Each structure stands twice: as C-alpha cells, then as structure tokens.
C-alpha cells in the first residue's frame, strides 16, 4: 500500500548517495553488532550511534540473530530511520513481506501447526487474502459484543486490583492484566469462553506467554544478567517440545469452543480447519494478547505517572464532559468524540510502539528517498526500521522526545496521523487484503481509548509505578 504523501517519487533535487555503513568482516561483524545491540549499547542507542556516525538515517548494519547457531540467517540489513525512508516498508509494489515478521530469522513452523500463518505471508500469495479477509470478518462480527464484554472484564480486573490494594500498598499489574486480555480476546475474537475449562481459565495466558517467549527469544532482550543472556538466550533457537503440550491444549480449546468461527472459516473463506485454528491462535496470541501485553502497561504507566497529574485532570474532564460517570454511555462512537483521550493513545503508540522493529524485503530494484538523499536498493535487500527512533523524526514531530498530550488534536494533529506507523502502515490507512496493515488498527486505538475513559469514569485519579498500581481515588 502506498502511504502518500511519503511514498511519492523522490524529488529530483535530492542527491543520489551510496548507502553508508558496512556489514564488517564475515562472522566477526555480525557478532560484534549483536553484542552491541543486546549488551553494550541496547537497541535504540545501537541505531542512534550508527546514525550519528554515518550522518545518515539510512545505512547498512547487522541485526540479530546471527552465527554461531543461526547459519541460515542473514543478519545484513539496510536501516531506515526517518519517517520518509521508513514509509517505503508499506509500499507493496516495491517490497514484499514473506517470512520477515522479525527479520531474516523466522521461528520454525512447528510453533504454528507446521504452516506459515498470515503474518509470514506476502500479499502476492493467494492464502494471504483469504486469511486477512477472515480476520477482518472476525473483528466485524466481534464488534457487536466488544464494548459490553470489555466493560465486564474491566470490572473484574479492577475489582482484583482494589482487593490487592486493600491488602498492601501495591497491586501487581501484569498477571491480572494478562488474564483480562486472555479472557476478553477469547470471548470477542474466538467466541469462546475460557471458563468452560478451569485449566485454560487459570493458565491460558501463561501458555501464550511461554509460546511467544520461546519463539522470539533470539530476537529480544529479556533482562538476564550478561553474558548469560547472550549465551543462553540469543545463541540458538529453542525447541518446540518445551511448549508443545500447552500449545496443544490451546489448539483443543479453540477446536472445542470456537466452532462457529471455525465453521465460518471453512464455508465462507475456504480455509481448512487446521489453517483456521492456527491462524486464530496466532491472531489471539501474537497480535492481540501479545501486542496489548506490551502496549497497555505502557499506556497505564503514562497515565498514572505522578508527573502527569495535570494530564489526568484534562483527560478526566473530557471523559466526564462527554459521557459522565455511567459506563452505559461508553461506546465506540462516544470515544471517537474524545479528542484528548485519542491523542493520548496515539502519543503512547508514537513513543512506545508495541512492535519496535519492522522489516520488508525489496521486491525489485528501486530508489529509496530519505529527507535529504536518494539511495539505490537492490532486489532482495532487507530493510529494517526501528520505530522508536523513526517516530522521533524532528522533521515531522515537534519536540519529538517529549510526551505531548495534545499532539494529535486539531487539524495539525490529524495531519500527523499520516506519519503514525505503529500498525504496519499509516494511522490514516485502511487495512485490506492487498497490504500488511494490522486488521485491528482501529479496534486497538478505540479499545485503548475505552479503557482510559472507563478509568476516569470510575476514578478521579490513579497512580502506577514500576509495573504496579499504587493508589486509586474513586470518583467523587
């Protein structure tokens, strides 16, 4: 999909420049870059230092994983770190997305039923359109019960938080939050109730956590003391048998309890039962549960930061002016009228995108433009964009390092949505079978807005610190 105006041909006035940087010596270069990425510099500093060194937002480097036990993985990438160059990742005429969800490394298909699920398919593959249309149909049908289900599950979660606060000074966020997410998305995406199985109800979210962690371990930092993390986590791919039993329990849960959705997948979208089951689990586990498990703690952390007391007051006022304190007034339509609440959600996604790195492979030779230069990209080269840096492009965003509540309000704010790319495309874009933009792009931002509105209907103020809820003041 073209993300105009950024994907328009480069102006002829821009100079053509060879791509700076190098991949270093064989074996040595990739390992040195891997150690910088995970250990000595960390990802954002890794890209920042190279951007400063080369005086360019486009350069060659290596990204993990790599040698010694990833011999089939090519770590060579062309980094694209400004808004203009990054936007080429969404132009499906010049790039393709087969098997590059997390770079040249792809977790074994045994994690997904011995098949490539939709996230690993290119738009040119017929199966992509079938599964993308199926996922959009799921969301459309789920939207009918989305809001009441969300409010019910939020009531349960915040009752747990309040009970924990009554016993101690803090309520740990992640366990209750992930249980909430698992229940909510099982009900709305699968049409399946986890409570029918005590094991799934109590441990389903843990099964998903371990399934995700084992697959993605070579590509993410988990905070283990170095060099143990490099030796034990980033040096090899973990075998599926470690999570096989629990994954098969999730497969059985979907097969038994999501029969209506599975039937529709087969009759209306010509998918096999196995294709539907494993794609549903990937949508549930990676896209919905995994994405929100990263996004919501950040959203709540921004909301509950003591430094943002003034921001809470503004958000609370907007929520109560629009919908009062009655949860029955909350709807997709009502939160669309909350300009500040939506801007708060967008600004969180700008500074902390749930999926920080995005990749695409050149479908053909083409000319890639940054703000100040044009570069020749060869067919087959892998492009890598690190969003936390891209979204701080000073040529697009004023005060890019600062959290600005009102950034996405009024006409200028609406224009900036063209350059908000957290969803694998611009916020103003439309997910279709011909692009790779997140099918739930709008549902994510509306759901987050509903959660913020719910909180300020229920509470005058909230405080979060170090992954815990530390205080609440109920609505007066």
From Swiss-Prot:
One of its GO terms (biological process) is defense response. GO terms for molecular function: heme binding; iron ion binding; lyase activity; monooxygenase activity; oxidoreductase activity, acting on paired donors, with incorporation or reduction of molecular oxygen. Its main location: plastid. Its EC number is 4.2.99.-. One of its GO terms (cellular component) is chloroplast outer membrane. Keywords: Chloroplast, Fatty acid biosynthesis, Fatty acid metabolism, Heme, Iron, Lipid biosynthesis, Lipid metabolism, Lyase, Membrane, Metal-binding, Oxylipin biosynthesis, Plant defense, Plastid, Plastid outer membrane, Transmembrane, Transmembrane helix. Heme binds at residue 438. Reversibly inhibited by nordihydroguaiaretic acid (NDGA) and irreversibly by salicylic acid. Its cofactor is heme. It holds the Pfam family p450. Induction: Up-regulated by wounding. It is a single-pass membrane protein. It is found in: Plastid, Chloroplast outer membrane. The keyword Signal does not apply. The chain crosses the membrane at residues 280-300. The keyword Transmembrane applies. This is Fatty acid hydroperoxide lyase, chloroplastic. It comes from Solanum lycopersicum (Tomato). The gene is HPL.
């Amino acid at each position: 999909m073209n993300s105009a105006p950024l994907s328009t041909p480069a102006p002829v006035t821009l100079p053509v420049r060879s791509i700076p940087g190098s991949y270093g010596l064989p074996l040595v270069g990739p390992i040195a870059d891997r150690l910088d990425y995970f250990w000595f510099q960390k990802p954002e500093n890794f890209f920042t230092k190279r951007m400063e060194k080369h005086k360019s937002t486009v350069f060659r480097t290596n990204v993990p994983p790599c040698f010694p036990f990833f011999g089939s993985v090519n770590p060579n990438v062309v980094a694209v770190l400004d808004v203009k160059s990054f936007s080429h990742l969404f132009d499906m005429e010049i790039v393709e997305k087969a098997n590059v969800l997390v770079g040249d490394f792809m977790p074994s298909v045994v994690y997904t039923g011995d098949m490539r699920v939709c996230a690993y398919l290119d738009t040119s593959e017929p199966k992509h359109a079938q599964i993308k249309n199926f996922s959009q149909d799921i969301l459309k049908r789920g939207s009918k019960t989305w809001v009441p289900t969300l409010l019910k599950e939020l009531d349960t979660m915040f009752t747990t938080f309040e009970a924990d606060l009554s016993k101690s000074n803090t309520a740990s966020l992640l366990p209750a939050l992930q249980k909430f997410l698992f229940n909510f998305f099982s009900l709305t995406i699968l049409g399946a109730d986890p409570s029918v199985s005590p094991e799934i109800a109590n441990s389903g979210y843990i099964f998903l956590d371990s399934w995700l962690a084992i697959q993605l371990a070579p590509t993410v930092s988990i905070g283990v003391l170095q060099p143990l993390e490099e030796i034990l986590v980033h040096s090899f791919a973990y075998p599926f048998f470690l999570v096989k039993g629990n994954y098969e329990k999730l497969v059985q849960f979907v097969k038994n309890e999501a029969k209506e959705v599975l039937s529709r997948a087969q009759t209306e979208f010509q998918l096999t039962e196995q294709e539907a089951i494993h794609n549903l689990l990937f949508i549930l586990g990676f896209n919905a549960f995994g994405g929100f498990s990263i996004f919501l703690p950040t959203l709540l952390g921004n909301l509950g930061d003591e430094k943002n007391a003034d921001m809470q007051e503004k958000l609370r006022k907007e929520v109560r002016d629009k919908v009062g304190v009655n949860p029955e007034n909350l709807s997709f339509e009502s939160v669309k009228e909350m300009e500040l609440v939506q801007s708060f959600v967008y600004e969180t996604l700008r500074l902390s995108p749930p999926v920080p790195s995005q990749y695409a492979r050149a479908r053909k030779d083409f000319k890639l433009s940054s703000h100040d230069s044009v570069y020749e990209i060869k067919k087959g080269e892998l492009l890598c964009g690190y969003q936390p840096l891209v979204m701080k492009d000073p040529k697009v965003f004023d005060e890019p390092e600062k959290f600005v509540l009102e950034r996405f309000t009024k006409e200028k704010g609406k224009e900036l949505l063209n350059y908000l790319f957290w969803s694998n495309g611009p916020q103003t874009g439309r997910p279709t079978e011909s692009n790779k933009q997140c099918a739930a792009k709008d549902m994510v931002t509306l759901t987050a807005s509903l959660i913020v509105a719910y909180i300020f209907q229920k509470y005058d103020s909230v405080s979060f610190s170090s992954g815990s809820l530390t205080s609440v003041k109920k609505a007066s």
